[in-house]
From Swiss-Prot:
HAMAP family: Azoreductase_type1
Lineage: Bacteria, Pseudomonadati, Pseudomonadota, Alphaproteobacteria, Hyphomicrobiales
Enzyme's top EC category: oxidoreductase
UniProt remark on cofactor binding: Binds 1 FMN per subunit.
Function summary: Quinone reductase that provides resistance to thiol-specific stress caused by electrophilic quinones.
Name used for this protein in its record: FMN-dependent NADH:quinone oxidoreductase
Binding site for FMN: S9, S15, V16, S17, M95, Y96, N97, F98, S139, R140, G141, G142
């Protein structure tokens, strides 16, 4: 069974989402024998954002692109293939300014491809990337869960549920540590609660 481990935090060793993804991987390795893990660090090795040249070169029947665009096409194809080959995907997704990091968005933009991970049929959208398990390690300084005063400002988890649901992954598991900026006690409690949730993860 293949697992794709994605980190996107820019905080390195100070990152809570990285701490959570590492713990999730350790837990899944414990309950799933022979797990084949691949790791992609989107902060250490960021992807370029989509460009007009890349989109034009991706169109059916497009003329041969210049060498740099051809390299970007190859990288995008490899990103998508890596995702589609995974049975389990673990994504570290810190909240930045109420949303996800631009590094993570650039990766997602390589996945949401018409004819590959979704299609339009009979006037509706059909996701084509179902059948894989998705676990998101969410970290945020404030409190944005349902019912919280700031819940309407959550464009992080809500976006991730929506975009992965769009491509067919409706059951998204979220391990959350929030309120991290509310003092050391609140931070420690949030991390402990997330750790407890990780220990309850079962094999796929």
């Amino acid at each position: 069974m293949k697992l794709l481990h994605i980190d996107s935090s820019i905080l390195g060793d100070h990152s809570v989402s990285r701490q959570l993804t590492a713990a999730i991987i350790a837990r899944l390795q414990e309950v799933t024998p022979d797990l084949d893990v691949s790791h992609r660090d989107l902060a250490a090795n960021p992807l370029s954002h989509l460009s007009g040249a890349l989109l034009a070169a991706s169109a059916p029947g497009a003329p041969a692109p210049d060498p740099s665009t051809q390299a970007a096409l190859g990288e995008s194809a490899a990103i998508l293939a890596e995702f589609l080959a995974a049975d389990i995907v673990v994504v570290g997704a810190p909240m930045y300014n109420f949303a996800i990091s631009s590094q993570l968005k650039a990766w997602i933009d390589r996945l949401v491809i018409a004819g590959k991970t979704f299609r339009y049929a009979d006037g509706a959208v059909e996701g084509l990337a179902g059948g894989r398990r998705l676990i998101i390690a969410s970290s945020r300084g404030g409190v944005f869960e349902a019912g919280a005063a700031a819940a309407a400002l959550d464009y992080q988890e809500t976006y991730l549920r929506a975009i992965f649901g769009f491509i067919g992954i409706a059951d998204v598991e979220i391990i959350r540590a929030e309120g991290l900026a509310f003092g050391e006690d609140a931070r420690a409690l949030a991390i402990k609660q997330a750790g407890d949730a990780i220990l309850r993860l079962e094999a796929a």
